Amino acid sequence: MSYRYMRMILMFDMPTDTAEERKAYRKFRKFLLSEGFIMHQFSVYSKLLLNHTANTAMVGRLKANNPKKGNITILTVTEKQFARMIYLYGDKNTSIANSEERLVFLGDNYCDED
C-alpha cells in the first residue's frame, strides 16, 4: 500500500464579541489542537494526513464539531505542494517547519551538535 501524504490547511473566522462566542472559539480551537492541527498564523492551522481517506474522515469530524457561528475554509494539498509554500516575514523565524522531511524538530532549542 502506498501513501500520499497530504496537508489540510484550515482557516476560520469566528466572532468573539460575547462571552458565549469566545467560549465557542476556545472550544473549537481546543478541538483543532486535540486533533493534531498546528497553528501557522492566528486562525490558520494545518494537519498532516496520511492519505485521501484520512482527509475525508477529518472533514467528517470537523463537520461534527462545526461552530454555530463563523466561517471555516478547508484546503487540502499534497505534502510536496505544502513544502513549496513561501513564507514572507520581517525577522527570520526558524521555528516554522517547511520541509519535506518526515521528522522535523520544531523550536530554537534543538541542536544536533554534541
From Swiss-Prot:
Its cofactor is Mg(2+). Keywords: Antiviral defense, Endonuclease, Hydrolase, Magnesium, Metal-binding, Nuclease. Mg(2+) binds at residue 13. It is an enzyme of class 3 (hydrolase). Disulfide bonds: none annotated. Pfam families: CRISPR_Cas2. One of its GO terms (molecular function) is metal ion binding. Disruption phenotype: Plasmid transformation is still inhibited. SUPFAM superfamilies: TTP0101/SSO1404-like. Its EC number is 3.1.-.-. GO terms for biological process: defense response to virus; maintenance of CRISPR repeat elements. InterPro entries: CRISPR_associated_Cas2 (IPR021127), Virulence_VapD/CRISPR_Cas2 (IPR019199). The keyword Thylakoid does not apply. It comes from the Bacteria. CDD domains: Cas2_I_II_III. Homodimer, forms a heterotetramer with a Cas1 homodimer. Belongs to the CRISPR-associated endoribonuclease Cas2 protein family. CRISPR (clustered regularly interspaced short palindromic repeat), is an adaptive immune system that provides protection against mobile genetic elements (viruses, transposable elements and conjugative plasmids). CRISPR clusters contain spacers, sequences complementary to antecedent mobile elements, and target invading nucleic acids. CRISPR clusters are transcribed and processed into CRISPR RNA (crRNA). Functions as a ssRNA-specific endoribonuclease. Involved in the integration of spacer DNA into the CRISPR cassette. This is CRISPR-associated endoribonuclease Cas2. It comes from Streptococcus thermophilus. The gene is cas2.
